[in-house]
């Protein structure tokens, strides 16, 4: 059973600049083990940047990031971009916080099975036969076992995203990060990806999800965070936030998006 009080992810006072533009203004957020947190916000609110700071795809200019209690060591240099002090630590923690991208990011020259096996074998150094068996089981679990020998170009967008989820799961991560996983999909393919994500949530997976899927955020996530102009404008239990939004900003956001998935 997940420990409900242990933070799986802890962000403190995260600031991020792109040139002279500060897109995150001291954001703090923690996710306990087993929590599913949806991160909502308009385009440009900083939500994807915040998610990418978790595993150092974007390095914060200030603040701290900890994954499963281990803080990532950052070197802040006057007048220059911050950088991780220890790339080995970053790579190790990236294995614990696996990212699923909007654009799938599958290796085009590898089969789906090879894509899922690649990191466990070559990054984690695990046994190839065991990784193959696990990869096949994961493809079965996400409903694309029949596509194991196909290449990404032969799959629909929904199938590619399910393969990307299987690839992330193959790393045996403690935390799953989803950056708008359905935004690149045709509307009729969104449901098959959300079903896999619902199943993962039901298993007690720790998940941080940047999404525009309002129904998913309301019904599946335990907590919702609403970003506006680089700060958290509202956060709380999802059922309460959607039923009784406390801020005008979030109320307007729900009205504009209709409170339903697209």
From Swiss-Prot:
What Pfam families does the entry give?
Answer: ABC_tran (PF00005)
Q: Which UniProt keywords apply?
A: ATP-binding, Cell inner membrane, Cell membrane, Membrane, Nucleotide-binding, Plasmid, Transport
Tell me yes or no: is ATP-binding among this UniProt entry's keywords: yes
Instruction: Name the positions where ATP binds.
Output: 41-48
Topology of this chain in the membrane: Peripheral membrane protein
Factors inducing expression: By octopine.
Q: Which PROSITE patterns match?
A: ABC_TRANSPORTER_1 (PS00211), ABC_TRANSPORTER_2 (PS50893)
Family in the record: Belongs to the ABC transporter superfamily.
Describe the function of this protein: Component of the octopine active transport system probably consisting of four subunits: Q, M, P and T.
Sorted alphabetically, which PANTHER family does this protein's record hold? AMINO ACID IMPORT ATP-BINDING PROTEIN, L-CYSTINE IMPORT ATP-BINDING PROTEIN TCYN
Q: What is this protein called?
A: Octopine permease ATP-binding protein P
Identify the species of origin: Rhizobium radiobacter
**Gene label:** occP
């Amino acid at each position: 059973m997940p420990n409900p009080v242990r933070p799986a992810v802890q962000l403190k006072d995260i600031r991020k600049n792109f040139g002279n533009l500060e897109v995150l203004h001291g954001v703090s957020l923690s996710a306990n083990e087993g929590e599913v947190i949806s991160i909502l916000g308009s385009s440009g609110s900083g939500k994807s940047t915040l998610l990418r700071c978790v595993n150092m795809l974007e390095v914060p200019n200030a603040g701290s990031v900890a994954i499963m209690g281990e803080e990532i060591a950052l070197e802040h240099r006057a007048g220059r971009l911050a950088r991780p002090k220890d790339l080995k630590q970053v790579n190790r923690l990236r294995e614990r916080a696996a990212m699923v991208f909007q654009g799938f990011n599958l290796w085009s020259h590898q089969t789906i099975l090879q894509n899922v096996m690649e990191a466990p074998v070559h990054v984690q150094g695990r046994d190839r036969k065991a990784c193959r068996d696990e990869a096949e089981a994961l493809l079965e679990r996400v409903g694309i076992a029949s596509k194991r020998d196909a290449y990404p170009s032969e799959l629909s967008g929904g199938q590619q995203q399910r393969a990307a989820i299987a690839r992330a799961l193959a790393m045996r991560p403690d935390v799953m990060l989803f950056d708008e996983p359905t935004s690149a999909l045709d509307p009729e393919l969104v449901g098959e990806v959300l079903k896999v994500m619902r199943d993962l949530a039901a298993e007690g997976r720790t998940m941080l999800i940047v999404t525009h899927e309002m129904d998913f955020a309301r019904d599946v996530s335990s907590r919702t965070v609403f970003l506006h102009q680089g700060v958290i404008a509202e956060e709380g239990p999802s059922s309460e936030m959607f039923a009784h939004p406390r801020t005008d900003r979030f109320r307007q956001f729900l009205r504009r998006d209709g409170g339903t998935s697209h």
